[in-house]
């Protein structure tokens, strides 16, 4: 399946703006990357695409490499001290350098001291190209981006890192600006009024975008483009969404199963012995794209239907399209192994999710939904939330993190509880060793303890939703309401103010990136989108239910708007609680901005 949306834009920018820009017929080149640039490349390009463009080998700059002095090298690197030193080292050897010449592409602006060091080194003689391509983010999905900076939550919210806050916000702003520039957007910027972070980040992004606009005056031009918006929200505006057990396929699988680096592992029972299979859950799999936002109750039904249709189209007979049946079909028709394996993977995945759900999760879901909504499935207001949660807290079979999720939802519903009540709840749940994790929600801006006992909830006003939903999936993320209000032009300007636009940057500053004289403008051949975009950035991580909302709102506008969403990193409930756990700890080894 060809890359979609954001992945296609970034893939094309790398192929056209980097590799093809220095390609010569009949000449092979070496491609050298560091870890961050390798993550960007592998998120949107296949190795076969790269090799088809005259690249003979792809190498890691931090690993030992055999010199190939007969070939020129393309370096795609993040502008860090470590990568720049490794680059300089490639051109220090005698009598020959590691490579014949260097075409250097930095993913972002190279700091002046490193730039000067490059100029003073022997490398300067071998440089044929030097560009900054401003691509400091990962296209995670067609409409989802990640800044690949999970450490930023700690740097922003841990009191021990208070001195790093400004630098961290500045680094995130630069990355967000490269996303807008890559999409050829110069959006109006809005933020949630209240928290300092959102306002500070919004102003910093505008300053960075103005520098890009000075360099590329056509940025954001087009009749519909003036309506594009960048919206910055903090995690405290919706701490509920990352806590809930979601029952849509992608969110449920990532919450309940052990999916590492988007890879699902499972045992297959073959003809003779069972073996482990590892499958990447990404947009190359069109079946995954079709199923990922469906409710689990519909997934198995849909896979079975699709499998039946496939079998009928190939004149295969099957009564019950299930996992066992699939292995028999495979025996008969090995030529369809690729397609049948895909169905098998998703049947396994759905089956796996349901096994976990039928264990302890099912009984938690209705409690969580009632607490999140503040009302039960019939719409009756919850009068005694304590009665709901005590059975869960006292149940020894419920894992600590699941108890904490329920506990935090209760605290959020009550807008904080008294110190005395909190201590009792923690004791009932037997989660004393996690008490600081629970209290750390305050570092994000949530209310955990309330001296008056219990406050009234200070939540954003929610939309009344009339569409039918499953009883255990009544909650919809706050950001979905906000997205809908933006595309309908009804978002409250007092609660979500625009950043006032300072005077345009004088053109004398525009040459900041043209330091090496042979700078080339990036003219990647991706067709720019004509309609407006809404780009949402959530400070502190984005939940998978929020990712789903971006696709749902885009679909509801029938393509008039494209909604993109992202953050420093993608959250699962476990990841969210792990992040909270660190916010009162003095940790060594967390990356500085």
UniProtKB/Swiss-Prot annotation:
InterPro entries linked: Sec-1-like_dom1 (IPR043154), Sec-1-like_dom3a (IPR043127), Sec1-like (IPR001619), Sec1-like_dom2 (IPR027482), Sec1-like_sf (IPR036045)
Q: In which tissues does this protein get expressed?
A: Expressed in testis, intestine, kidney, rat adipose tissue and 3T3-L1 cells.
Keyword Nucleotidyltransferase in the entry? The reply is no
Q: Which GO terms describe its biological process?
A: cellular response to type II interferon; exocytosis; leukocyte mediated cytotoxicity; neutrophil degranulation; protein transport
Could you tell me the superkingdom of the organism this chain comes from? Answer: Eukaryota
Kindly state one GO CC term assigned in the UniProt record: tertiary granule
Which UniProt keyword terms apply here? Exocytosis, Protein transport, Transport
Q: Name one GO molecular function term.
A: syntaxin-3 binding
Quaternary structure, from the entry: Interacts with STX1A, STX2 and STX3. Interacts with STX11.
Q: What does this protein do?
A: Involved in intracellular vesicle trafficking and vesicle fusion with membranes. Contributes to the granule exocytosis machinery through interaction with soluble N-ethylmaleimide-sensitive factor attachment protein receptor (SNARE) proteins that regulate membrane fusion. Regulates cytotoxic granule exocytosis in natural killer (NK) cells.
The record's comment on protein family reads:
Belongs to the STXBP/unc-18/SEC1 family.
Q: By what name is this protein known?
A: Syntaxin-binding protein 2
